[in-house]
Amino acid sequence: MMERIRKEMILMERGLHSPTAGKRFSSLSDSAGGAVLEALENSQHPARLSPRLPSAPLHGALGDLPAKGKFEIDTLFNLQHPSSESTVSSEIASATESRKKPSHYSEAAAEADMSSDVEVGCSALRSPSGLGAAPLKENNAKGYTESGSVAGTTTSASGSGLGSLHGGGGGGNSGAAALGGSGSGSGADQVRRYRTAFTREQIARLEKEFYRENYVSRPRRCELAAALNLPETTIKVWFQNRRMKDKRQRLAMSWPHPADPSFYTYMMTHAAATGSLPYPFHSHVPLHYYPHVGVTAAAAAAAASGAAAAASSPFATSIRPLDTFRALSHPYSRPELLCSFRHPGLYQAPAAAAGLNSAASAAAAAAAAAAAASSAAAAGAPPSGSSAPCSCLSCHSSQSAAAAAAAAAAALGSRGGGGSGGGGGGGAGTAGGSDFGCSAAAPRSESGFLPYSAAVLSKTAVSPPDQRDEAPLTR
């Protein structure tokens, strides 16, 4: 009887995990033989444990059935087996845990190593998707470890031990992620570029090269890089920035040009004189729209005395003599106006005598001078005091244009004489007509000109179309 009870206890410890053992264990005292046979059958196949059984029913079976067994055995035979049973179950649990621990630890360690290798070198870690993939991987690994613990362990102690082990593995993953983050931060610091500090010699050499050629070829860039001890990429970027700067300067300075070329010339000339422009500027159109800018008293006195041919520059800050031949070759929209710069005496003396503000006296004087000039041109002889014909476009007009100019000048003279109301304007006009000379060899400065009245400009002789075609319009 004792032998049978001992066998039943051993079979109970071995075959408790089968589903049928729990059902038949309550009828152990009634049908001992059947229980022994079924327990023997179950003991022959201990590996039929279903790995997908949840841990709670197993734990319940482990917690409830030994209580029944203890109660029945103690009541029947008065044997104290709880200590032995607990020691046996703890031995089994410890053996199972020791058998499962190394494998799970190696898997977790391998997973941590793999994740650390991947996350440190992968660029996905820097993106939000990579950061979201790390918790997903951790959750997957946790589920895998929990399923393994359910399949391989029979006590809650082993499950908690593996949970703590996996927690350590998760800590390893987080540590690897932190390491990868620090590595990416250091790489970003290394990629950051700082501004290149050019020396004065380097800037001077680059500016000189830019004046010579805005676009530099690659061989030339290589030569400059070797000469200036700079990377080729730096020189390329410098030339790109320099071209953009030049474009901005030209756009900023060219805003008055379509409406007023004179103001554009004035601004650009003064900018070149003050050193604001890095490139030389050649003034093409003289300054005739702004009489109040820099007109000197010396020029006014010289004009009043009638010495218009020898008058000095009317601008206080004269930059350079304005080349009238270059001005004539400039594609200006009204080339007939450029004749006035070859004949400053036509408008200079009467305007100065009238105080630079009397439009009537200026118109009268201009009418008289224009009448004299047109009559001389109609007679086929050069004007008085001139040894060679003028090179301006208006002086090379045809006979029809000269006749039209004479008619316009006569009409303008009658209108100007009525407006003057006195003989002073007429006297000044005759003086201006006598002083008028259409010679390029006259002893005067090339930049000696004064502004003229808009009424005179509107009545000036106009070149025929064939003459005007020589100066194309480039607006």
Curated annotation (Swiss-Prot):
Disulfide bonds: none
Top-level taxon in the UniProt lineage: Eukaryota
UniProt keyword annotation of Nucleus present: yes
GO biological process, one term: limb morphogenesis
Subcellular location(s) per record: Nucleus
Pfam families in alphabetical order: Homeodomain (PF00046)
GO molecular function annotations of the record: DNA-binding transcription factor activity, RNA polymerase II-specific; sequence-specific double-stranded DNA binding
Keyword Nucleus assigned: yes
Major location (coarse): nucleus
Gly residues bias: start-end ranges: 160-186
DNA-binding region: 191-250
Region (Disordered): 82-113, 155-189
UniProt keywords, alphabetically: Developmental protein, DNA-binding, Homeobox, Nucleus
Composition bias, Low complexity: 83-96
Gene Ontology cellular component terms for the protein in this record: nucleus
Record-stated family: Belongs to the even-skipped homeobox family.
PANTHER family the record matches: HOMEOBOX EVEN-SKIPPED HOMOLOG PROTEIN 2 (PTHR46294:SF1), SEGMENTATION PROTEIN EVEN-SKIPPED (PTHR46294)
Protein name: Homeobox even-skipped homolog protein 2
Organism name: Mus musculus (Mouse)
Gene name for this UniProt entry: Evx2
